[in-house]
Amino acid sequence: MATPTPTVKIGFIGPAFNNAFTLDSATNGRLDNTDYVLGGTEILVDLTSRTTSLRVKRGRKDFTQPFRTGTATLILRNIDGELDPLNTSSIYYPGVTVGRTVTIDCNGQSIYNGTITNIELGYTVNGDAWVVVRAADGLGDLATREITDGTAFTAQKSGERVTAVLTNAGVNFQGTSAINAGLSDLAAETLSSATNARSYLRKVINSEQGYLYGNRSGVLTFENRYGPLADTNKATFSDDGSDIAYQRIDRRVATTELFNQLSANRTSQDPVLVNNTSSQDSYGIRNLNLGEVLVLDNSTVTDLLDLMLVKTASTETRIAEITAVLDTLSGSDITAIAQLELVDKVTVEFTPPGTSQQIAASSIESIEHNFSFGTTWRCTLGLIPQIVTSYLVLDNATLGQLDNNSLGF
């Protein structure tokens, strides 16, 4: 067994962290140096020794919804008052502030990169004091930006539309991004009013049935709908000691995920409906409206809905979550878990009571890390069967099963 080691860093700008180029300064004013730059930049400071707990949440719990903003919550010890913005003698003055970078590593592997959105300072009359830091990734940043009124988009692939939104003057996304070209062809359109960037991008994602998320290193990532299909197995979890051990597995089937009639509409057009009549005969009609999609024609809308229907009409029991306790694992297994990303493929081996061992190929829908100093580090992965996230693949034992996967488009 190995001990998972966190590293928590927060960006600071202040007198003690001044790296701005300064004229007539013997230190900061040297030409041709790379340490002091115009305007200065934030400097990441290691606050691991002050951290009492951390929580990271990324992904989604409901596969019918877009990925949520990835968040992190840190609790920092502040008994000496060094993190208080009123403490002008502190090396950290003017203290932790919003908009600064937060990075969290586990055993040297990045598990979160975002910016501070909220700071709470508290203390007791007995002398205890702390700072709660909350952060959000790039998706949260997009929620505060608007695409400018009158923006004209040309007919283009979904990935090109994502890039056009990010580079729009009203959005001006400054973070790092990795945008796939996409597969869906989107119609040209001109926006009649300023439009929230994240809301519009969700229409693009619906039109692709792809994935948009901030990855563990803070890169805003767009993947097309083939993402899980092209992935190789990143980790195998087992209950027999042969692979990465997990402590708990949760399997479920829920009516909140059961939909056998799906609808969506192109801009200013009537809705298109698709039905799974077999499921409707058993459970009645359960409708899910995917809203507006930006594709060129109704036949493509039908294809998108048929793909989604493969996921939503199933009533088979599926693995919803597995939880691993990192303190019980080897160093290599801890690293393997820390490196996992949303949409990654993993394999889970499990043995329900009264049955033989089962093997499930799954895609990661959510990742949650919880750690408090003095206790164990737990990582919970939200999963969905890969058989309902991918296309039919001939001669493939998992993805080649009839009546499960969808023909590609």
Language-model features: locations:
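Charged/polar, solvent-exposed surface patches and flexible loops
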Residues: 160-168, 303-310
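Hydrophobic, Leu/Ile/Phe/Ala-enriched alpha-helical segments that form helix-helix packing faces
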Residues: 10, 106, 165-170, 205-208, ...
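N-terminal export/assembly leaders
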Residues: 143, 162-192
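Alpha-helical structural motif
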Residues: 127, 131, 158-161, 260, ...
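An acidic/polar, Gly/Ser/Thr-rich interaction patch typically located in mid-to-C-terminal regions
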Residues: 59-89, 179-228, 234-409
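Short, cationic low-complexity segments
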Residues: 23, 102-103, 153-167, 288, ...
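Short, surface-exposed linear patches
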Residues: 96-97, 125, 136-140, 154-159, ...
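Assembly/oligomerization scaffold segments
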Residues: 1-154, 188-194, 198-209, 243-247, ...
